[in-house]
Amino acid sequence: MKYDLVGIDGNAFNIISYVMSAMKECGFSTSDRNDYFKEATSSDYSNLIVISDEMINRCNEIADDVLISKL
């Protein structure tokens, strides 16, 4: 697992920045990153955490696939 929200400062802006950086590293388009931002900020902090965790899981799946393909 390359990406993890555990250990990240719990400030909402830090979480969003971390997730968006992970998405960029994984090749997500600007449009995808903007969609994440809109969804993550559409409600309360709990929503932000749920949406961010789901996206980090997707990023980890992509990172794992890339790692496996290099073996």
Regions found by a protein language model. Name each.
Residues 1-71:
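Long, contiguous binding/interaction regions
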